[in-house]
Amino acid sequence: VINPGDESMLDAFYDYMLALDSEEEDMVFLIELPFSSRTDFSKDVVGYIAQQVEYWNNSKKPEDIVFERVDWIADYKSEEAENDASVAVANFNKLTESLVKGTDMKCSFVFNLKNTYDYDGCREWFEKALALPFHKQMVWGISDIKDYEQFGKLMAKHSNDAVSIYPPIDLDGAMEQLAEQAANEDKSD
């Protein structure tokens, strides 16, 4: 949960988490999609992640990047008719198992739901997702804005499984640190 106006800092944090040279050891997938509909969102997010996996498997990587092919194929037929979120949960459980089995790492799926208009449907979809079993090493994250929270009640209802994090994003302090770092680099040149 971030303060209003800190959206660009959150985007910068996402970029940091996804950077190849980041010290982040856990697997992180950022899903940048607005919620579409309860019936289509699972297929949308699974398709989005399938595309990311395909990019990873087929892209050229710097020599210093340890490459391991991701052997996972999206299964759009794993849907339970009564639960619209089942396709996403089942696929993400399988992908998590494939990526982090036998390690102490986590596999995180972070939903950046910018430009979502149907938050009622979105909350219902996440409610259905939370009713399904999650892989023990899988974590889901949703960004929200303080005082405009769309998921506060959902988080409270699932307080044993969910936690709200209020990161201390200090844009002014960050700018001061960048300026100080730049000044120090200029002195050393």
Role assignments for model-derived ranges:
Residues V1-L95, G102:
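Extended, compositionally biased accessory segments flanking or bridging domains
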Residues V66-S78, K106, R123, P133-H135, ...:
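Intrinsically disordered, low-complexity segments enriched in charged and polar residues
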Residues N91-L99, F126-L132:
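Alpha-helical bundle protein-protein interaction modules that mediate dimerization/oligomerization
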Residues L99-C107:
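Short basic/glycine-enriched coil/helix segment immediately N-terminal to the Walker B
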Residues C107-F126, L130-P168:
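Sensor-1/coupling segment of RecA-like P-loop NTPase cores
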Residues N160-L178, A182:
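Conserved AAA+ ATPase "SRH/arginine-finger" region at the nucleotide-binding site
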Residues A183-D189:
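Extended amphipathic alpha-helical coiled-coil/heptad-repeat regions
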